[in-house]
């Protein structure tokens, strides 16, 4: 039968086609003959099994495998012949039960018309890792491994304060009876800023009453938006003891030489990797937002958007589960809340693919290798991780997709109207 294409929606198509029976039977016979040459069945010598026995033993499975292969080959040929560009996988059903006529339903990529990226305005950030950033990271590492000793003087920023508190908000006392025990490192922001400031200079046994006004969105509902008297009593004040940056300290971070220059070089490499990731992520968001603004009027394939929304919901459910919470109360239609974000993500993805195709952008294998080395360098056995990625098609597909997207994003940014924004390392990674 001839291939029949029908439009059943703005972006949905139905394609009716058939697999030639003579071609199917020819391929099945050929495959069964291949099996017969090596098949081992009890009672027969290898390669001497009768064709009838081979057909009885393997015929049904082989026919299903060959039909699936020919079905997809025939469908792909029809799609190419009619210049159809699919947005997602096709759903294939039998047109007649048990026959060789099939119906494929799928969505197509929308027509974006002319794509002129030179009209887009992109803010491109730049930043560098400096010696000051490396010094700060070393200080952070020292802080991570600090110990504490009882202080003989009042609390300062960076000191650990153990305390008891109770609050009076109008006629309401919190807690109703007794006190709440807790601790905070001054300047860490664990407690409300006004409370931490009120603890500065206090020593063990000191008490104070602090007049605090909590913001409307404060996490404790009874205190939110209220002027409160917070009664504090200091139980203990401890000062930090920082380790010396010596050979032992440096080796504890995997720097075998124990030398400071090697330690700083490792830190610089890590910070530069973090910075690159932050700059690339920002550029991806920046270009994505500009593409969304310019092409928001283009209709997106509804089934593809719904699929993306369900994937986003599934990811959130997994995050809830990993955090130890129970996601079973989430309703079945919760994906609807992700539809807007999913539509934008699909729009950017299709546009990136369209731009790559129209401009014949090709995946840079050298960049893929560099990305693999970058990923592997974050592990203790980088060469093993590198080879693991190289030998796993799914992992490689993910890396290649990421690299291709980065290439297209940079291609767009290079041709858009650019505004350069120079930031410090800290500004770049925090925004």
Curated annotation (Swiss-Prot):
Gene3D superfamilies: 3.10.50.40, Trigger factor ribosome-binding domain, Trigger factor, C-terminal domain. It is an enzyme of class 5 (isomerase). It is found in: Cytoplasm. Its EC number is 5.2.1.8. GO terms for molecular function: peptidyl-prolyl cis-trans isomerase activity; protein folding chaperone; ribosome binding. Keywords: Cell cycle, Cell division, Chaperone, Cytoplasm, Isomerase, Rotamase. One of its GO terms (cellular component) is cytoplasm. GO terms for biological process: 'de novo' cotranslational protein folding; cell division; chaperone-mediated protein folding; protein transport; protein unfolding. It comes from the Bacteria. InterPro entries: PPIase_dom_sf, Trig_fac, Trigger_fac_C, Trigger_fac_C_sf, Trigger_fac_ribosome-bd_bac, Trigger_fac_ribosome-bd_sf, Trigger_fact/SurA_dom_sf. Involved in protein export. Acts as a chaperone by maintaining the newly synthesized protein in an open conformation. Functions as a peptidyl-prolyl cis-trans isomerase. This is Trigger factor. It comes from Xylella fastidiosa (strain M12).
